[in-house]
Every structure is written in C-alpha cells, then in structure tokens.
Design a protein with these regions (language model features):
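Short, glycine-rich nucleotide/cofactor-binding loops
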Residues: 4-20, 43-51
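Histidine-anchored nucleotide/phosphate-binding helix
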Residues: 16-30
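Short internal beta-strands
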Residues: 24, 35-41, 69-75
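Short, intrinsically disordered low-complexity segments
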Residues: 37-47, 63
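A glycine-rich helix N-cap at a beta->alpha junction
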Residues: 52-82
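A short aromatic-anchored loop/beta-hairpin motif
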Residues: 61, 80, 86-100
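Short, structured coil segments at secondary-structure junctions
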Residues: 65, 88-89, 105
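C-terminal binding/interaction regions
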Residues: 105-111
Length: 112
C-alpha cells in the first residue's frame, strides 16, 4: 500500500500536526508502507518554520528519506511563509495537483 499523509492542521491544533509528523516518521522508519509521501497544506505550513525538538528531528528524517513531497505555494503565500519553507528545503507547488497525482497513482490519503 502507498500512503499520502496530508498535513492540514496548524496552530489551531498543533498536537494533531505533531501526531501526523510523528506517525509519518515512524511509518517510514518501520517501512509500514510501500511508499509514503507528505504534502503540507494550509495551516500546517505555518508550523514548519517553527519546528524544534522531536518535531524537527521527525521533519529532518522524513526530508532525508525523500518522503516530503511539497507544500502548497498558494497557502505559503497566504500565510507569508514562502521563505521559511524554502529555507527548510520544501518544494512549493500546487497542492491540488500533487494530491490528484498521488490519488491517481493509487495512494491512500491519510489526513492530519
């Protein structure tokens, strides 16, 4: 099975964001899926530039593993976090296109 983790939660629910990031990192480390990709969308994009401790470690391990696909450029502009995302190495693209690509490629969407 292939999974797309769609991280949507932000400052309104940071624990939900952390759970998604942690679950993704543990899933990649344990090779639970044939493939796992992450798309950050909306409020979650604000948190990426503020990551620390376990969250930062999880993000970095996912980045090194190639699991992080992208963040939505329109939402990055809306939240004024384009530079923070680019500084973390996150590719900016159109989330709708990326989600459609993964769904059409047989990935199951899991959202946090």
């Amino acid at each position: 099975m292939k999974a797309l983790f769609l991280l949507l939660s932000g400052k309104e629910s940071p624990e939900k964001f952390r759970i998604g990031l942690r679950a993704a990192a543990r899933s990649v480390a344990a090779k639970r899926y044939d493939d796992l990709k992450i798309v950050f969308f909306g409020p979650s994009e604000e948190l990426i530039g503020e990551l620390k401790d376990e969250d930062l470690q999880n993000f970095e391990s996912l980045f090194k593993a190639g699991a992080i696909d992208s963040a939505c450029i329109a939402e990055a502009q809306h939240y004024n976090v384009e530079e923070k995302l680019k500084n973390k190495g996150v590719v900016l693209g159109h989330a709708g296109e990326r989600i459609a690509f993964y769904v059409n490629s047989g990935y199951t969407v899991i959202s946090f």
